UniProtKB/Swiss-Prot annotation:
Keywords: Cell inner membrane, Cell membrane, Membrane, Protein transport, Translocation, Transmembrane, Transmembrane helix, Transport. This is Sec translocon accessory complex subunit YajC. It comes from Buchnera aphidicola subsp. Acyrthosiphon pisum (strain APS) (Acyrthosiphon pisum symbiotic bacterium). The SecYEG-SecDF-YajC-YidC holo-translocon (HTL) protein secretase/insertase is a supercomplex required for protein secretion, insertion of proteins into membranes, and assembly of membrane protein complexes. While the SecYEG complex is essential for assembly of a number of proteins and complexes, the SecDF-YajC-YidC subcomplex facilitates these functions. SMART domains: YajC. Its main location: membrane. The chain crosses the membrane at residues 20-40. Part of the SecDF-YidC-YajC translocase complex. The SecDF-YidC-YajC translocase forms a supercomplex with SecYEG, called the holo-translocon (HTL).
Amino acid sequence: MSFFIQNANAVVNGTSESSNSYSLIFMAVIFLLIFYFMLFRPQQKKDKEHKNLINSLVQGDEVITTSGLLGRIKKITKNGYILLELNETTEVFIKQDFIVSLLPKGTLKSL
């Protein structure tokens, strides 16, 4: 509502529209900064943490996948796949990107 009053006063006082356009540009810049820090920056941090997790994986680590599978890494291939041992008789190949988190040692034995 105050925007209309400012416009009415500007017309009466004969001021130019340049001050109004500066405030519009200022609000757009503030909006873009808020958008960046609320959406893009957290996603970049999350991607960086996930990349560090993937690079730190070694044979014998116990992990959980995006689909909820718990297993021990048996083999890591050079082309980005992991042989995951779910139990003594079941092994699956999965893409490294599907690893969500690293579990503490001995988690699989306690289940």
